[in-house]
Amino acid sequence: MALLASAIYSCDDTTGSLGLDMLPGSDNVNVSSTSFDVTTKSILSGPVFAKTDIGYVGKYTDPDFGYFESGFLTQLNCTDSLQFPFGVMAGDTAHLAELVLFYDSYFGDSLNACKMSVYELNKVLDKSHYTNINPDNYYNKSTGLIGSKSYSAVDLSISDSIRNSSNYSKYVRFVLPKSFGDDMIKLNKEHPEYFYNADAFIKNVFKGLYVKSDYGDGTILYINHVNLNIIYNSHYTDSLGNFLKKKDG
């Protein structure tokens, strides 16, 4: 019988209790699982210090957490001692003024129809501010509007080949009134000191932007870069700085 028992153990490949048989019975742990009903609720936190390089804009309704809406205020920097090349410009006016908001990612519906508006600030933002900042204190809704734009997170008017390229960045583009660019060029010519650095530019030329969601529940854009472009016409010049004329034909 002892030989038979030994043969049975040699053929048993069950390892579930391997090692446990060598432990004292007092060291065995009995494991069981169960479930409990719990109740949760969301509590609105107080204001926190706002320090981020991402601007969120859009609206979203969550079945569990409710309605969420976001816009952002931002300032624009200019390069030190920025100056338009008046010597080669074809006139002292702008050809085009545009504002471009770039984003790498978004949350929600990619094709949801949305609209946003951009307002110029009439007050310089504080150096330090918290999330309970009231945008209404920094712009005039009646006179500060500089552009509105309908959009979706994925722009199907742009071909797949371009959107899928490695150097493509998603964006929302506003074409601004030409007078916006004309005024900035004029100010640059008359007061170059206003463009000496970013602080002078913000204080004297352009205090900043408020980007506000108008409609389109279901999409939040994560804006990570804002460009203000003033485009102008200029003359072609040779190596001596002489203007070149277009040849006939």
Predicted regions and their residues:
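Secreted, disulfide-rich extracellular signaling modules
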Residues: 1-249
